[in-house]
Each structure stands twice: as C-alpha cells, then as structure tokens.
C-alpha cells in the first residue's frame, strides 16, 4: 500500500495528503477507516499539534504514548514507527507476533511476560538489534545464516 501511495499520490506530507481526494486514498488499498485515520493524523501534523521535531526529542516510551493518541495507532504501530521511522536503537516489541515466534524458536517454548521483561532489560540499549535478530529467527533463519 505504501508503494502505491508514493507512486500514485505524490509526496506523503501532511499538507499534500489533506489535498487528496478521499476516494484516491481508498483506491490505493486503504480501508475507509484507515484513510480517515491518515487524514486525521495529517490534520494534527499540519496544524502543529504533532511536531516531528518533538518526537525526535522524546524518550522512546514517550514517543509511543504520544503516537497512540492518534486515531488508528495502537502500541504495536507506535513501536514500529519508533523503530523504523525514528530509527531508535532500543525498541523490542513483545506485541509483535514475529518477535514472540523468534523467542519461542530461541528458547524452545513461549516466554512469560516477566521473562520477556527481563529479556528487554538485558537487551537494552540494543533492543532494536534484538528485534531484527528475532524476526530473522522467526522467518526460519538461524545463528549461522
């Protein structure tokens, strides 16, 4: 969907997204709810309520807390934005199915929440690297791959 948005809709800036016809957004594969949420988020960024500069200055958990105030953005989405868009080094999302599957493959069993939290502390400040490794394991990769 992101590829179609970039190819068919032009720059994905808040101002430009607000200028697009709602049905053009839908035609890129977005549900009505997602198209509406994207427009609402664009409004909040365009009117200055959301400042990308501020997001870069906040701690990781503060970024997640701020992002989940956007309609349609839950904790997992906020963590993925924190990891991939903001490029943070210490994001380990236990809400991610791939990460949980990687942990199961690594430990041979599902981990409890307490065990996952201990792992988060041990992986810090390199939680994002741990995330990439666990996704690799979940997709069938191994230590020697």
Q: Each PLM stretch: what is its role?
A:
Residues 36, 60, 75-145:
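C-terminal accessory module of base-excision DNA glycosylases/AP lyases that mediates lesion recognition
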Residues 1-71, 122:
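Alpha-helical ds-nucleic-acid-binding substructure associated with the helix-hairpin-helix region
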């Amino acid at each position: 969907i992101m590829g179609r948005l970039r190819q068919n809709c032009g720059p994905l800036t808040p101002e430009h997204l607000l200028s697009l016809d709602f049905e053009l957004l839908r035609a890129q594969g977005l549900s009505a709810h997602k198209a509406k949420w994207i427009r609402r988020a664009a409004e909040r960024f365009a009117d200055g309520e959301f400042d990308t500069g501020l997001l870069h200055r906040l701690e990781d958990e503060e970024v997640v807390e701020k992002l989940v105030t956007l309609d349609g953005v839950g904790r997992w989405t906020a963590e993925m934005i924190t990891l991939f868009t903001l490029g943070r080094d210490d994001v380990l999302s236990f809400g991610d199915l791939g990460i949980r599957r990687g942990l199961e493959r690594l430990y041979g069993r599902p981990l409890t929440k307490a065990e996952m939290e201990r792992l988060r502390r041990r992986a810090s400040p390199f939680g994002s690297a741990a995330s990439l490794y666990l996704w690799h394991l979940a997709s069938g990769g191994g230590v020697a791959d």
